[in-house]
Structure formats: C-alpha cells, structure tokens
Amino acid sequence: MRHQIQHLLAPLPGTARQIDSFHFGPEGGGKIYIQASLHADELPGMLLAWHLKQRLGELEKQDRLRSEIVLVPVANPIGLAQVLMDVPLGRYELESGHNFNRYFADLGEEVGNRVEERLNDDPRHNLRLIRDTLRVALAQQIASTQLQSQRLTLQLLACDADIVLDLHCDYEAVAHLYTTPEAWAQIEPLARYIGAEASLLASDSGGQSF
C-alpha cells in the first residue's frame, strides 16, 4: 500500500487540512478510484472505506490485485469539521454556501481544443492523450480557496481512472446509483451486485458535480 498526502490551501494561519489517498495494486495497468463522504455528513461511506482498506491490504499481500485501486476514505475534510451543537453540517460549505458536490472544474471544451489536432485512429493513443491533457489542464488551475483546492485535488486523483466510484448515502432510500449512459455497460454488473433498485443515467446531472 502506498499512502499519499495532498495538502489543501490553508484558509487561515495556523490551520491545515489534507486529502489522504491509499494506493493498492500494480501501477501502469487499469485504475479504479473510490472516494467516500464527499457530503461529509454521509458517514456510512467512510465506514465502508475503512473495511475496504483492510480487505484491499489483504488482497495486495496475496498478489491478487490486477489493477491499481485508489481509495480516499475522507473526500471532504472541510465539511467533516463543520459541526454545530453536535449536528454535522457537511453538505454545504458554511463560508460560501456551496454544495460540496458542485462546481468542480469543467475542462471538457478546453481539453477538446488541445487534443483535436492530435487525435488519430488508435483508441489507446487517444485515451492516453486525453487523460494526459486533462491531468495537465487540472494541474494548471490555480485555487484561491481551500474548497477549490479540495475539488482540484480530488479531480487530479481521479482523472485518469477507468472506473470512478463516489460513495454517497441518504437518510431514507433504496439502494441506487447514478452513472452515464456511456458507462452503463460497465456499471450494470455492479448495480446488480449491490442490489440497486434504481439506476439513474444522465450524461450531465448538472451543477458540475463530481
């Protein structure tokens, strides 16, 4: 297991927050990215991530992982610290009022313009080119707030993954998942495995969510 720490922009002197990511399995093959509790008051995702971390460590020791798996158990340390009179307030940032799962950097058009003249008939070349270009474009973004630095950190960790899982929960709901129509063929087996009673497909859910 490889433990990486990404420091966030500090909003005030004497304060510091970070994103911890745990990397399992071989690099250079496929990549799966899993994060939990982007809405920091949705705690079951963190519990699941803790158990998953133990299990992935066991599988790595047994050399049974075929792809890299990146696990971020606490995707929102900012929201996790927002507690008022023992009530967690981790869905919206108190300073800006922004939903923590909104306003991620939308660089699709910019990346498209950068790669347009360099695409060819090789899908692997195109995939590698688009991911590399996206990574560079994200790294060139300059965060001016801690929330912006948190968003960019998460996007940089996930931008080159083959599969991205963002774990949420609700106070009262059946098991369900969101994905895109393009990814449905890959995600449908997972939906069946977790017993999802509803699967919502949309190319763009709006709000620049993760």
State where each predicted segment sits.
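Structured catalytic-domain cores with a bias toward divalent-metal coordination
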Residues: 1-210
